[in-house]
Amino acid sequence: MKKALMFTLLGVSLAFAKPYTIDKANSSVWFEVKHFKFNETRGVFDSFDGKIDADPNTKALNIFEGKIDIKSINTRNKKRDDHLRTAEFFDAMKYPKGSFKMTKYEDGKIHGDLTLRGVTKPVVLEAKIQAPLQNPMNKKEFMVLQAEGKINRKDFGIGKTFSDAVVGDEVKIELKLEAYAQ
């Protein structure tokens, strides 16, 4: 009886879930790292893609995964961006993509596996979901997903020869995604 009830509730929950398409023009994947301990360097990955399946009423995520194009890194400094693409940092030639795949969602936390430079580590992102929303211009249903977390760049072999005094070990990750119901 308990199993039947559990599967019924699971089925009802999934019945309201729907896929969403990320509106890349109104979305971003940011990072921030300390530079010489006192200043922050912010950057963005201009090219990314992802998959979202969510229940807009309960604001629960069923699927959340994405990929970034490492070559698209942009800190508004070409020399620095070119250096970040080298083997010393992201090694974009050998590892052209980074990825994240959710393993669990609960209580506003996205648990998942982040892969950078061929290294996969568990990461937890604090999430805020606003849904269901309606675009006042085209009347389409959409959602806004904001998530942030922190990683240690050295765990992924990124800039491992640079001390924390030059490039901070801790990197803040920030996602701001606008996505439309399919």
Where are these regions (language model features)?
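Low-complexity, acidic/polar, glycine-enriched regions of mature
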Residues: 17-182
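Sec-dependent N-terminal signal peptides
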Residues: 4-13
